[in-house]
Swiss-Prot record:
Keyword Ubl conjugation tagged: yes
Lineage: Eukaryota, Metazoa, Chordata, Craniata, Vertebrata
Post-translational modification: Auto-ubiquitinated; leads to proteasomal degradation.
Cellular localization per UniProt: Cytoplasm; Nucleus
Function: E3 ubiquitin-protein ligase that promotes the ubiquitination and proteasomal degradation of SIN3B. Independently of its E3 ligase activity, acts as a CTNNB1 stabilizer through USP7-mediated deubiquitination of CTNNB1 and promotes Wnt signaling. Plays a critical role in the regulation of nuclear lamina.
Pathway terms, separated by semicolons: Protein modification; protein ubiquitination
GO molecular-function terms, A-Z: beta-catenin binding; ubiquitin protein ligase activity; ubiquitin-protein transferase activity; zinc ion binding
Chain positions with Phosphoserine modification: S390
Cellular component, GO annotation: cytoplasm; glutamatergic synapse; nuclear lamina; nucleoplasm; nucleus; postsynapse; protein-containing complex
Catalytic activity: S-ubiquitinyl-[E2 ubiquitin-conjugating enzyme]-L-cysteine + [acceptor protein]-L-lysine = [E2 ubiquitin-conjugating enzyme]-L-cysteine + N(6)-ubiquitinyl-[acceptor protein]-L-lysine
GTP-binding found in the keyword field: no
Stated name of the protein: E3 ubiquitin-protein ligase Rnf220
Length: 566
């Protein structure tokens, strides 16, 4: 059987690429003749033409595995030099309609339909296999499939004439019927079509052509009319459901966009842009892409509405705060200025520009044209608002009697400072006498009870007197002056007495010292100007030299000193 099948040119790689020569056919014919049963009567021989050449690799009907070479020569015994008076077993009689005898009723199949009679159609080449694509990938070969790839077959009859079959036409066109009729005549001459087909009426031939057209379109892979995708039979249901889902989603998205566009407060520009976009959509765009774009625009519009609402909320809150603040200020003042504001607004335009007359002509003052007047031009102006009159008494003398009581010290209590020069001392005494108006000086502080050392006080007496004063001890509260230098015991006792004195000062709280004499306070005084505390003698001696606080240099008079108790 393989040798018989190898006689024709096949597209599959399992077959031989070149047809066998005529001697091989003779050998096969003689083998078949020897095995023929002599009891089977012979029938009228029928001419049969063998294809001598094929221009292109085409899907020939008898390349199918179910067809056998021996079945072609069934009851072909009358041909000289071939199978004479020999029939093949009935199991081999699986014939194509072109080679079937008249007594076999086989449904004719058009030569245009490149399909076998088996259950599975074999793929002839790699290009043919690639033409069947998935339903989810774009089609590569959508049209003009039969224009350039049409097969050219040449057949020869018994007389040696050759016939060429050229371009295939669609089965539904009128020209295809003519080609089929011409092909049938040629096949009838070559013995490839039965007498029943050639002798049939034109009506029968038209019916058979319709059946051929139906068989042609049924055998091809289906094509989706919407997205133009080739589909397999197993993908039809799934692809149809997918298209229906997209069709159902399309009206919903359109309706949602229309509702959003017709919402109250939508700007006219957005409505216009939405209508222009709907009109500008191309009809060839896929429903899935258009639905995606509509959803994207809807999301953008929702974002815009949310941002605008937030902004308006912030502005309204700020305006509300300003209004509440103004209302509070109006309530505090206790007066309503609504009527006055209305009057000002009415007369604002009339008094906006200041007019004056010069040389008999009315002119407008240029400064009133500027917003803000002189202040708008850059000049500094004083406030035009007049302060309300105040009946409060102005204290010019600085009388603090009601607040701090009567003055406790006067100018007579000040201890004057003695100068080194006689002329300067005389001037100080004259100035002091003028201030006191001839009154006697105060005796609050005497040299005997002074904390300041007498050697630091300059004196106008002779040198002997100064030496005697220098020999006197200045620390009246200490017993050190009773100690003599000759006795070490007395020195030790004096130190013990000093320690006990310091302990008593710490026990009674004398831990604060005057910053002038660096000793514990003796009758502390403070100034009502700066509230610094010093000893009485320190204040009076400082004011005798200058009328300033010894700590902060604030102007201080003797009447500003007050006695305090620590």
């Amino acid at each position: 059987m393989d040798l018989h099948r190898a006689a024709f040119k096949m597209e599959n790689s399992s077959y031989l690429p070149n047809p066998l020569a005529s001697p091989a056919l003779m050998v096969l014919a003689s083998t078949a003749e020897a095995s023929r049963d002599a009891s089977i009567p012979c029938q009228q021989p029928r001419p049969f033409g063998v294809p001598v050449s094929v221009d292109k690799d085409v899907h020939i009907p008898f390349t199918n595995g179910s067809y056998t070479f021996a079945s072609m020569y069934h009851r072909q015994g009358g041909v000289p030099g071939t199978f004479a008076n020999r029939d093949f077993p009935p199991s081999l009689l699986h014939l194509h309609p072109q080679f079937a005898p008249p007594n076999l009723d086989c449904t004719p199949i058009s030569m245009l339909n490149h399909s076998g009679v088996g259950a599975f159609r074999p793929f002839a080449s790699t290009e043919d296999r690639e033409s069947y694509q998935s339903a989810f990938t774009p089609a590569k070969r959508l049209k003009n499939c039969h224009d350039t790839e049409s097969p050219h077959l040449r057949f020869s009859d018994a007389d040696g004439k050759e016939y060429d079959f050229g371009t295939q036409l669609p089965s539904s066109s009128p020209g295809s019927l003519k080609v089929d009729d011409t092909g049938k005549k040629i096949f009838a001459v070559s013995g490839l079509i039965s007498d029943r087909e050639t002798s049939s009426s034109p009506e029968d031939r038209n019916d058979r052509c319709k059946k051929k057209a139906v068989a042609l379109f049924d055998s091809q892979a289906p094509l989706c009319p919407i997205c133009q995708v080739l589909l397999r039979p197993s993908e039809l249901q799934e692809h149809m459901e997918q298209e229906l889902e997209q069709l159902a989603q399309l009206p919903a998205s359109k309706n949602s966009l229309l509702k959003d566009a017709m919402a109250p407060g939508t700007p006219k520009s957005l409505l216009l842009s939405a209508s222009i976009k709907r009109e500008g959509d191309s009809p060839t765009a896929s429903p899935h892409s258009s639905a995606t774009e509509d959803l994207h625009h809807s999301d953008r519009y929702q974002t815009f509405l949310r941002v605008r609402a937030n902004r308006q909320t912030r502005l309204n809150a700020r305006i509300g705060k300003m209004k509440r603040r103004k209302q509070d200020e109006g309530q505090r003042e206790g007066s309503c200025m609504a009527e006055d504001d209305a009057v000002d607004i009415e007369h604002a335009d009339s008094n906006r520009f200041e007019e004056y007359e010069w040389c008999g002509q009315k002119r407008i003052r240029a400064t009133t044209l500027l917003e803000g007047g002189f202040r708008g031009s850059g000049f500094v102006m004083c406030s035009g608002k007049e302060n309300p009159d105040s009946d409060a008494d102005l204290d010019v003398d600085g009388d603090d009697t009601l607040e701090y009581g009567k003055p406790q010290y006067t100018e007579a209590d000040v201890i004057p400072c003695t100068g080194e020069e006689p002329g300067e001392a005389k001037e100080r005494e004259a100035l002091r006498g003028a201030v006191l108006n001839g009154g006697p000086p105060s005796t609050r502080i005497t040299p005997e009870f002074s904390k300041w050392a007498s050697d630091e006080m300059p004196s106008t007496s002779n040198g002997e007197g100064s030496k005697q004063e220098a020999m006197q001890k200045t620390c009246k509260n200490s017993d050190i002056e009773k100690i003599t230098e000759e006795s070490a015991v007395t020195t030790f006792e004096a130190l013990k007495a000093r320690v006990r004195e310091l302990e008593r000062q710490l026990s009674r709280g004398d831990r604060y010292k005057c910053l002038i004499c660096m000793d514990s306070y003796s009758m502390p005084l403070t100034s009502i100007q700066c509230w610094h505390v010093h000893c009485e003698e320190c204040w009076l001696r400082t004011l005798g030299a200058k009328k300033l606080c010894p700590q902060c240099n604030t102007i201080t008079a003797p009447g500003d000193l007050r006695r305090i108790y620590l």
